[in-house]
Regions:
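Phosphate/nucleotide-binding beta-alpha loop and adjacent structural elements of enzyme active sites
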Residues: 1-217
Length: 217
């Protein structure tokens, strides 16, 4: 879920007025709509209906948690969109532990934390596109919500990241070295910070987090 609120004005979820001072969706406020979306960290697929309104079936989701994948895949596939059960990372084909807080299943992370452990398999986004014969040029919005693994996800995309016009990325530890590294990586790839969402405090680790919106220069 984007912390900027709904993407589509008619979504039944409250859009809110904190981020842009109105109750319109994100794309309305950007005066822009995507032709295709790559969404990493699907969870409950709340966004699938909104993406379908703008770009039909041309959206791809990744979900690392196999239980969430099975539970919510129909929410995505009903629109003809694709979903894959992999953990996006900077190395292919590793078996890694995914830590799942029992009371915050939407906060599952490859970074060690309290919670139940399930095993998941990694893939770089570049390899996913090669193996599935997907074309980066068909997607211009990247949405990343991976609870602390955002830098590794970006590294796994490589130079293909310049195909995206906008990147929405949740930064889960504001003020940290991690936040600095993510920002430096994106600016080195030709993006600039367009806007931050309102800040929130995590109920899992107590750290401040927000969504950041980057735009290709």
């Amino acid at each position: 879920m984007s912390l900027f609120g709904a993407f589509w004005d008619l979504d039944p979820n409250p859009v809110g007025t904190d981020n842009f001072g109105n109750n319109k969706g994100l794309f309305y406020n950007l005066e822009w709509t995507p032709k295709g979306v790559l969404h990493i960290g699907a969870w409950d697929a709340w966004e699938a209906k909104q993406y379908a309104h703008y770009c039909g079936s041309n959206s791809i989701f990744l979900e690392a948690n196999p239980n969430s994948y099975l539970r919510f895949k129909n929410e995505i596939e009903q629109f003809g969109q694709k979903i894959y059960n992999f953990a996006a990372w900077n190395v292919d084909d590793l078996e890694m532990k995914l830590y799942c807080p029992p009371y915050n299943p939407d906060s599952s992370s490859l970074l060690e934390q309290n919670g139940d452990v399930v095993m998941t398999k990694t893939i770089t986004i570049k390899s996913l596109f090669e193996r599935e014969k997907l074309n980066f040029s068909n997607y211009d919005l990247l949405n990343i919500d991976t609870e602390g693994a955002e830098l590794q996800v970006l590294e796994g995309i490589g130079d293909e990241i310049r195909n995206f016009t906008y990147i929405i990325i949740e930064v889960s530890d504001l003020g940290s070295e991690f936040e600095t590294k993510v920002h430096e990586y994106l600016t080195n790839q030709g993006f600039y910070l367009y806007k931050e969402s309102t800040h929130h405090r995590s109920s899992v680790n107590g750290k401040m987090f927000c969504d950041k919106l980057y735009k290709l220069i």
